[in-house]
Amino acid sequence: MDQKQIEEIVRSVMASMGQAAPAPSEAKCAATTCAAPVTSESCALDLGSAEAKAWIGVENPHRADVLTELRRSTVARVCTGRAGPRPRTQALLRFLADHSRSKDTVLKEVPEEWVKAQGLLEVRSEISNKNLYLTRPDMGRRLCAEAVEALKAQCVANPDVQVVISDGLSTDAITVNYEEILPPLMAGLKQAGLKVGTPFFVRYGRVKIEDQIGEILGAKVVILLVGERPGLGQSESLSCYAVYSPRMATTVEADRTCISNIHQGGTPPVEAAAVIVDLAKRMLEQKASGINMTR
């Protein structure tokens, strides 16, 4: 699927919802544009600020304009220069700050108050704490007994599409992108005439947990929005794992269709919502997902 097709899908879905489609290319540009490049090295800078991210550490460059253009084109740590064989102080501090940010989002918990504020039912996997979640991924693939009973009692049975939200390995991915992806996603699915299940939040969930959810609720398509493992300095990236008619015993990873890198600096959440709606419709039409879908 090329960019033109994606933009057509976005316009179509947003039009059916009675909303104006965003300009994806402009959104991406705005998200990745840095402030004016800074060449002076100062440890007083806020390492998470736009000024620190725009810092250029190459001394006496042959083509300063090339470095300036490169620095403005990405939020990656480029043009940092060297001090002999070693990184410059500012570059090292930014590296450590980005690493800390990524580590924090893995270890943080999604606040219970936030889940309640979104009006979501909260269930959890067999995991009871973050340390166990990181060391026992197998337990994150199954719901606890209380969660199974809660889903049977409080969720719509036999939906065409079931949407699930899980913290995964990035708390920020959920809390930052939620408002921009879930409302247009739910509205788009309903506008498509699909029976949509009750969206809910799974704490300490792994990707394969959607198989059990689909089996319990009898969902034709399960869409899991889960926090991605963060990269250095990028802690807000969300992934969508969609699967048709999942079963715990038979569904394998090749049966899933993944849309990754959903955030303002990658695929904008609103654009991703439109693409997911189109994907769900095609899965239902073809009765397949993953590598079994015709492209």
UniProtKB/Swiss-Prot annotation:
EC number, UniProt record: 4.3.1.7
Keyword set, alphabetical order: Bacterial microcompartment, Cobalamin, Cobalt, Lyase
Note accompanying the cofactor annotation: Binds between the large and small subunits.
Reaction(s) the record says it catalyses: ethanolamine = acetaldehyde + NH4(+)
Binding site for adenosylcob(III)alamin: 207, 228, 258
Chief location: other
Keyword Lyase attributed: yes
NCBIfam families on file: PRK05465.1
Protein name: Ethanolamine ammonia-lyase small subunit
Native organism taxonomy: Bacteria, Pseudomonadati, Pseudomonadota, Gammaproteobacteria, Enterobacterales
Gene name linked to the record: eutC
